[in-house]
């Protein structure tokens, strides 16, 4: 996507003024424990909910472990989606579940992941290809 390093914002440092600057938000998180959201995100969600997201595209991505936590694979992406779906943002970057091995995930809505799930533990050989395909998809969806 050609995002400069200066535009990468740590969620723990994010504020409403930063969010206002962008038309597209790429929001990433890892899934912790048994399907939990990374702690920093709870305050980040509060910041985002105070912003007008109605004219913004939001693309979600996250990391998980499809083997050890197959029943909560990348659930944190699903938590972000659930928290933001009433903000009227335009979600983009949904990914087909084909090619992923897992039992359950709240990040799957209508048969697709609501964002890009990555598994660097068990499927690291597919990460680069998945990211490239997702970036192209997001570019098309926001153009």
Regions found by a protein language model. Give the residues of each.
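A short beta-strand-loop structural module common to alpha/beta enzyme folds
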Residues: 3-15
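FMN-binding flavodoxin-like domain, especially the glycine-rich phosphate-binding loop
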Residues: 4-7, 21-143
């Amino acid at each position: 996507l050609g995002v400069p390093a200066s535009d990468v914002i740590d969620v723990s440092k994010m504020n409403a003024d930063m969010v206002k600057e962008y038309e597209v938000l790429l929001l990433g998180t890892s899934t912790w424990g048994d399907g939990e959201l990374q702690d920093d995100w709870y305050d980040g969600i509060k910041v985002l909910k105070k912003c007008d997201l109605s004219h913004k595209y939001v693309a979600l991505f996250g990391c998980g472990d499809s083997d050890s936590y197959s029943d909560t694979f990348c659930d944190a992406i699903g938590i972000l989606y659930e928290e933001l779906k009433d903000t009227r943002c335009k979600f983009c970057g949904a990914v087909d579940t084909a090619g992923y091995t897992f039992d359950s995930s709240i990040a799957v809505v209508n048969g697709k992941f609501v964002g890009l799930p990555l598994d660097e533990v068990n499927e690291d050989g597919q990460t680069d290809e998945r990211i490239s395909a997702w970036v192209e998809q997001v570019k098309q969806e926001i153009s």
